[in-house]
């Protein structure tokens, strides 16, 4: 596996290698990331992963400084998974100057749910993804990028960005990987203490219960179902930000009874000091 730190070195490594399949990450890798890398190997001529903890998508009070950096383990896992090129830029490589130009996503999609509770988050995400796409695909004529469904709203925002800017990038979604008890794998699960880890699956169960209830009740009842789901989770010791049911297409609440297979239940809640997100399509 070749490791490139600068954009120039990355582009040199990609020269004459064909179409890349690219998996962007912030490191601290788990099976969800590695499954995307393995899938990428079937979708391009050369498999590229990146590790970069992007300061722009963290709010001032969030965990940028404490976010786990596990370079040696990540590098070894990527090599075993079959990654051809690891792009690991330093901050000065990706942001050599203050990033005064930013990508502002559509507020109808990016200012609700995660965007409401983490203002500016998706601006930071879109800006770094645009820079990464430029680095990886800028001299290759396009390719494929893979993102996990666990970060559902992020996936949708990036898809919309690619459409709006007519980028020559195919976005492929990977299914959420889960622990045997049903907890969605996440780099932030490592923050959980033993007792919290046992309880953490309660978020997934709450979303399953909410999705089942939504299918059996009219749309007019959904706000009450969502409030009850949040109250139940709060009673189990969580601090919920939201538990909602939305259309997959645009993350809005339907006006009329939707067809099964077009909806997603999404949730975000804090257990102790750890904020977890999850979702279920149904």
Swiss-Prot record:
InterPro entries: Cyt_trans-like (IPR004821), Pantoate_ligase (IPR003721), Pantoate_ligase_C (IPR042176), Rossmann-like_a/b/a_fold (IPR014729). It is found in: Cytoplasm. The keyword ATP-binding applies. NCBIfam families: cyt_tran_rel, panC. GO terms for molecular function: ATP binding; pantoate-beta-alanine ligase activity. (R)-pantoate binds at residues 57, 154. Its EC number is 6.3.2.1. The reaction proceeds by a bi uni uni bi ping pong mechanism. Keywords: ATP-binding, Cytoplasm, Ligase, Nucleotide-binding, Pantothenate biosynthesis. This is Pantothenate synthetase. Homodimer. It holds the Pfam family Pantoate_ligase.
């Amino acid at each position: 596996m070749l490791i490139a730190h600068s954009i120039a070195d990355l582009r040199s490594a990609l020269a004459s290698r064909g179409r890349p399949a690219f998996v962007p990450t912030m490191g601290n890798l788990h099976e969800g990331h590695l499954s995307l890398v393995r899938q990428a190997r079937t979708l391009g001529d050369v498999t590229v992963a990146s590790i970069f903890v992007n300061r722009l998508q963290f709010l001032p009070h969030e965990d940028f400084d404490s976010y786990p950096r596990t370079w040696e383990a990540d590098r070894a896992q990527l090599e075993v998974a079959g990654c051809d090129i690891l792009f690991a830029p330093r901050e000065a490589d990706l942001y050599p100057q203050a990033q005064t130009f930013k990508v502002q996503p559509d507020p109808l999609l990016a200012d609700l749910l995660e965007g409401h509770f983490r203002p500016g988050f998706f601006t930071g995400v879109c800006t770094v993804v645009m820079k990464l796409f430029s680095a990886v695909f800028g001299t290759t004529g396009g390719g494929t990028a893979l993102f996990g469904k666990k970060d559902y709203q992020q996936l949708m925002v990036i898809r919309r960005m690619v459409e709006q800017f007519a980028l020559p990038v195919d976005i492929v979604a990977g299914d959420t990987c889960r622990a045997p008890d049903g907890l969605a794998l996440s780099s932030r699960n490592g923050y959980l203490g033993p007792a919290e880890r046992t309880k953490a699956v309660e978020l997934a169960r709450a979303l399953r219960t909410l999705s089942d209830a939504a299918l059996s009740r009219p749309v007019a009842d959904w706000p009450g179902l969502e409030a009850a789901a949040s109250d139940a989770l709060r009673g189990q010791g969580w601090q919920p930000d939201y538990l909602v049911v939305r259309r997959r297409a645009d993350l809005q609440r339907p006006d009329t009874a939707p067809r099964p297979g077009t909806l997603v239940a999404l949730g975000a809640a804090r257990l102790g000091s750890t904020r977890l997100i999850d979702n279920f399509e149904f």
